[in-house]
Amino acid sequence: MSTETWNLFVAWAQLLLLFRISPQYVNAKPCPSVCRCDGGFIYCNDRDLTSIPSGIPDDATTLYLQNNQINNAGIPSDLRGLDKVERIYLYRNSLDEFPINLPKNVKELHLQENNIRTITYDALSQIPSIEELHLDDNSVSAVSIEDGAFRDNIFLRLLFLSRNHLSTIPWGLPRTIEELRLDDNRISTIAEISLQDLTNLKRLVLDGNLLNNNGLGERVFMNLINLTELSLVRNSLTSPPANLPGTNLRKLYLQENHMNYVPPNAFADLTQLYRLDMSNNNITALPQGIFDDLDNLTQLFLRNNPWYCGCKMKWVRDWLQSLPSKVNVRGLMCQAPERVRGMTIKDLNKELFDCKDRIGSNTIHVTTTVLNSLLPAQGQWPVPVTKQPEIRPPDINKIFRTTPIPVKKIITIQVKSITTETIYISWKVALPMTALRLSWQLGHSPVFGSITETIVTGDRTEYLLTALEPESPYRICMVPMETGNIYLSDETPVCIETETAPLKMYNPTTTLNREQEKEPYKNSSLPLAAIIGGAVALVAITLLALVCWYVHRNGSLFSRNCAYSKGRRRKDDYAEAGTKKDNSILEIRETSFPMIPINSDPISKEEFIIHTIFPPNGVSLYKNSHSESSSNRSYRDSGIPDSDHSHS
C-alpha cells in the first residue's frame, strides 16, 4: 500500500470517528451550578439543598446528596432516567417516606438518619436491582412495612435497620439476604417463620433488644445453615439460645445478658465456632465438658461473671492447663469462696477447691417431706415477680419442718453467707428429677416481699445468689419437679431463712480483680499520709515567712541609705522620656529660682524664657540630638527609661 493511499485512509477514519462521537459532545449536559462533577461522581452534599438539582449528567454513576435538607417532594421525576447511577447517598436529610423516582438500576442506597416511617412495595419495586439498603436511624416500625414489600428485590444482600422502632422481624424478607442488622430496636419475640427462608444469611445482629428465652422460638435459628456470626448482646437471655446452627457458625456473642445457667449441651456440634463471648452475665459455674465439641475454639471471653470456684469448677482448671497456647481464655477469676477470691482458676491447686467438704461449719440444714401428687408446671425460665416487701427481724436459726407424712422424696438444703451480697446454696435430692424451682425473697414472710424465681436442672446441686442486700434477712425456698415436668401436689416448698453477712465482717471490695482488692489497704495509709503532708506544709510556710521577714528587713535598711528612690512616682518616667508633659518638674519659687529678664526692655505678656531644672548629676530631663548617643539610660520596650538608672 502506497503512502498516499495510507494517508487517505487515515483521514477518512478520523472523519468518520469525528462524526460518530460528535453527537455525544453536543448532547452532553453541564454539571449543575450548585454541584461539583468529577467524571461519574456528582458531589452535591453539604449545601443545604431542599431538592435534588436538575440537569445531572447522563453519565453519572454515584450521587453524593448527604447532609442536606432534601424532602420527598424534592426528588424530581427526571432522576429516574439516569440509568447509569448505581450508588446514591441520601443520609441526613428530611425524608419521611421511602423515596420514589430513584434510578431503576441503583444497587446501593444510603438513607440513614432521616425520619422514614413507611416502606411500601410501590417504592421498593422501582429499584429491583438494589443490593445494599441502609435504613439505620429512622422511624420504621413493624406495622409500617407493607406485607411483601421486598418481594421484588431478589438481589438484596445487605439490609440494615438498626435503631428503628421494630418490635418483630419484618416478614417476607428475600432469601438472598446475607447480612441483617436489627440492633437497638424493640424486638421482644422472634417467630420461627421470621427467619426460616433466610438460608443464605451469614451475619445476624440483634444487639440491644428485649429478647428473652421465652421470646425465641425453639427452632428459630435452625434453618440458618450458612450463618457464621450471631450477636445477641444486651438482651435478657437467662441461658444461651437452644438449637444453634452448628454447620458454619464461627462467632457467637452473648455478653451483657442475664444468663445464670449454661446447659451441658448449649454448644453441642458447634465444631466451627472459634470465638465465644459470655462476658458480663451472672454465671457462677460451667458444666463439665461444655466445650468438648468446640474443636476450633481460639477465643473465649468470660469476664465479669461471679465465678464460684467450688469443687464443680475443678475440671475447668484441668481443662485450662491442657489447652494449647493458641487458645486465648480471659475472665475466669474467682469471686467466691472468700479464700480464693481474686485468684484465677488456672492458678488454683486442687486443695483450694475443697472437694471433700464444700460447705462450711456455719451451714444450716433443713429437711422436709413432700407429697407425690402433681400439679401443672410453669415456664422453664419464669419472669421474676415483685411484690411490696414487708421485712421482719431476721431469725437465721429458725428451721422449718413439715408434718411427718408418708415419705416419697427428701430434699436437704444447706446455705452459707459467702459475702455481704452473696449466699451459697447447695442441696441433695433422694431421687432424680428433671428440675427444681428455686426462689428467694427479702424478708421472712411467705406472702409479702420481693420474690425472685428461677428453674435449675436436676443435675445441679448448688447455686450462688448474688446482688443481695447486705445484712438483710432472706427466705429461700425450693420446689421439686417430677420427670413429667410438673410440680408436686401441694407445692409444699423446702424453705430456709438466713441473712447476708454484715458489712463489717467482709472486705468492701466485690470486684474480681486483684488490683481493686488492694484499694482498701491503700485507704488505711491515708491518715499517715495526711499527717506527713501537713508537717511538710507547716515547715514550708515557716521557711517562707522567715524569707519574707529577712527581705523586708534588708529592704528597709536599703531604703534608708538610698533616699533618692523613696517616693518616686511612676509618671516621672514618662516626664523623663519626653512622652508626657509634667508641670510639677517646673517649679517657680521666689527664693530658689527667680525669673530674670534678658534685657531691661519691658517684657510682654507672652514672652518668657523658662530655665529648665537639671538634676544634680547633670543628666538632662529631655532628649536632644547631642546627648542621645552618650546617655547611659536604659529603656524598656515602650521607650520609657528604666527606673533603676534614672534619678530625680
Swiss-Prot record:
SMART domains named among the record's database cross-references: LRR_TYP, LRRCT, LRRNT
GO terms under cellular component: axon terminus; axonal growth cone; endoplasmic reticulum membrane; extracellular region; focal adhesion; growth cone membrane; plasma membrane; synaptic membrane
Chief place where the protein resides: membrane
Disulfide bonds: 31-37, 35-44, 309-334
GO BP terms, alphabetized: cell-cell adhesion via plasma-membrane adhesion molecules; embryonic morphogenesis; fibroblast growth factor receptor signaling pathway; head development; heart development; neuron projection development; neuron projection extension; proepicardium cell migration involved in pericardium morphogenesis
InterPro entries named among the record's database cross-references: Cys-rich_flank_reg_C, FN3_dom, FN3_sf, Ig-like_fold, Leu-rich_rpt, Leu-rich_rpt_typical-subtyp, LRR_dom_sf, LRRNT
Fibronectin type-III domain location: 409-503
LRR repeat intervals: 58-82, 83-105, 107-126, 127-152, 154-179, 181-197, 198-223, 225-246, 247-269, 270-293
Extracellular side: 29-527
Organism superkingdom: Eukaryota
Transmembrane domains' residue ranges: 528-548
Residues the record marks as carrying a glycan: 226
Cited PROSITE patterns: FN3
Keyword Iron: no
Pfam families: LRR_8
Function: Functions in cell-cell adhesion, cell migration and axon guidance, exerting an attractive or repulsive role depending on its interaction partners. Modulates cadherin-dependent cell-cell adhesion and cell sorting. Plays a role in the spatial organization of brain neurons. Plays a role in vascular development. Plays a role in cell-cell adhesion via its interaction with latrophilins that are expressed at the surface of adjacent cells. Mediates axon attraction towards cells expressing ntn1.
Subunit structure of this chain's protein: Interacts with fgfr1 and fgfr4. Interacts with rnd1, cdh1 and pcdh8. Interacts (via extracellular domain) with unc5b and unc5d (via extracellular domain).
UniProt protein name: Leucine-rich repeat transmembrane protein FLRT3
Organism: Xenopus tropicalis (Western clawed frog)
The encoding gene: flrt3
